[in-house]
Amino acid sequence: MRIGEWMRGLLLCAGLMMCGVVHADISTVPDETYDALKLDRGKATPKETYEALVKRYKDPAHGAGKGTMGDYWEPIAISIYMDPNTFYKPPVSPKEVAERKDCVECHSDETPVWVRAWKRSTHANLDKIRNLKSDDPLYYKKGKLEEVENNLRSMGKLGEKETLKEVGCIDCHVDVNKKDKADHTKDIRMPTADTCGTCHLREFAERESERDTMVWPNGQWPAGRPSHALDYTANIETTVWAAMPQREVAEGCTMCHTNQNKCDNCHTRHEFSAAESRKPEACATCHSGVDHNNWEAYTMSKHGKLAEMNRDKWNWEVRLKDAFSKGGQNAPTCAACHMEYEGEYTHNITRKTRWANYPFVPGIAENITSDWSEARLDSWVLTCTQCHSERFARSYLDLMDKGTLEGLAKYQEANAIVHKMYEDGTLTGQKTNRPNPPEPEKPGFGIFTQLFWSKGNNPASLELKVLEMAENNLAKMHVGLAHVNPGGWTYTEGWGPMNRAYVEIQDEYTKMQELSALQARVNKLEGKQTSLLDLKGTGEKISLGGLGGGMLLAGALALIGWRKRKQTRA
């Protein structure tokens, strides 16, 4: 070994002994993630952990980029903000080369609200965190800051004894702790989840662990889904999203499927408030509406009403772990229930998922009593028993499961009827006016595409009705049950609307059968070389099936009478 190499090795060892090696054994990140990344959780440094996470995060084979249907669509102007890693390019103006303070000065004039929000943020006030006293309920933030600085030292972005002065524009939009100037037309980036993960490694790793723990026993959903970690992948791998030419409509879906790409859906820029993200309203923008009305169901539940009535008395700044004990919280919130897993609070919100919102997905209901599902049910019981007895919790969760299965059975009966019509070729226009959907979608019955694309009689009205019964009404029934909103699964939403859809489907099916019987009767009569207008026998004047047959028969009899009168006069 050469002397120079030997000296460098000696100095490195000495440095490590002096400052100690920081390991990233993050207790809230499950073993499955360390295994998937091929890391030893007891030895991996923050740098090694971060690099392994980012390598997977940016790998097209693991969901990055345009996806497998990328040839069928092109980004529009707004797309650069939906998936910055793939599409964002720095602006061509202003042609400025600026340092840290210049960003704030310029944007105070150009985008003043951004700057005001940032000045209120923890990012802009790190010394306030350092000065917190141990009896302050926010004291935990001091430990978080120290963890962030240790991460940055491991990554070589902060000196051994250096502290982070602030997190300003240049840190997120160029590079953390950048000392020199940046070219506005070359160096600017739009922050993505891995940008935030540079400092917030724990939270990034927790969120990314959804890929490893959301694995269904029989492949009911693709691995890692549904989740925040792969919600953009789920979006662009949806056939109709890639197929539809109305790209502005498609990007409406994207706007709620960008948690994979960035963190500001929950932590709004440029304040990035943890307190804001703990409030139920932070979830409402996306977890609402006709196919997943979680917000509506929660707010109309007793849980939601308690939160609404008492929220002004709660300290939203305390960490979730302390919300009930130190923050005055006395009712569940979205975060309190869904971010909790067996006593820990993390950004992995899928470890208790059992129904995944859509009970009609093949294999979901069949799996609900499996050991996999029962273990997750037990984890939910632990969540619920923070406020309820175990007997009550298990009783209610049993009601939820069985109520969902009852709704599923109602849908399945209706779906079987419409599917038979499809197989028989008797849906409206099925043989005469049913254009194929745009590529890459393939023709089929009751496919998700038909909620967002239509042409001619594709889909038929009954086909769309039973599809909405599954995607919307059954989903809302389950959500109402899961969020303890009685009207949300019995009357206003769920069972009531499903019952109406069922009745309408049965009505149309019966009319179709009667019309078919009428057609068969007419065909039979024509086969006797007898015109319908020449009916004479009483047996041939019987009802031919429903209103249509009756009207046709009445018209025929009137014409027969007219012919007889004409013959008599002649």
Swiss-Prot record:
Binding-site residues for heme c 2, renumbered to this chain = 169, 172-173, 270
The residues that the entry says bind heme c 3 are: 123, 196, 199-200
Ligand binding (hydroxylamine):
292
Q: What class of enzyme is it?
A: oxidoreductase
Q: Which residues bind heme c 8?
A: 303, 384, 387-388
Name the gene for this chain. Answer: hao1
Q: Note whether GTP-binding occurs among the keywords.
A: no
Q: Which cofactor is essential here?
A: heme c
Give the residues the record marks as binding heme c 1. 103, 106-107, 184
Query: Where heme c 4 is bound, by residue?
Result: 253, 256-257, 491
Coiled-coil blocks: none
**Record-annotated residues binding heme c 6?**
228, 283, 286-287
Catalytic activity, EC? 1.7.2.6, 1.7.2.9
Organism from which the protein derives: Nitrosomonas europaea (strain ATCC 19718 / CIP 103999 / KCTC 2705 / NBRC 14298)
Q: How does it assemble?
A: Homotrimer; subunits are linked by two covalent bonds between Tyr-491 of one subunit and heme P460 of an adjacent subunit.
Q: Which GO terms describe its cellular component?
A: anammoxosome
Specify the signal sequence span: 1-24
Binding of heme c 5: at which residues? 263, 266-267, 347
Protein name (database record): Hydroxylamine oxidoreductase
Q: What does the UniProt record say this protein does?
A: Catalyzes the oxidation of hydroxylamine to nitrite. The electrons released in the reaction are partitioned to ammonium monooxygenase and to the respiratory chain. The immediate acceptor of electrons from HAO is cytochrome c-554.
**Pfam families xref list:** Multi-haem_cyto
- One MF term in the entry's GO annotations: oxidoreductase activity
Where in or outside the cell it occurs: the entry states: Anammoxosome
Q: Which reaction does it catalyse?
A: hydroxylamine + 4 Fe(III)-[cytochrome c] + H2O = 4 Fe(II)-[cytochrome c] + nitrite + 5 H(+); hydroxylamine + 3 Fe(III)-[cytochrome c] = nitric oxide + 3 Fe(II)-[cytochrome c] + 3 H(+)
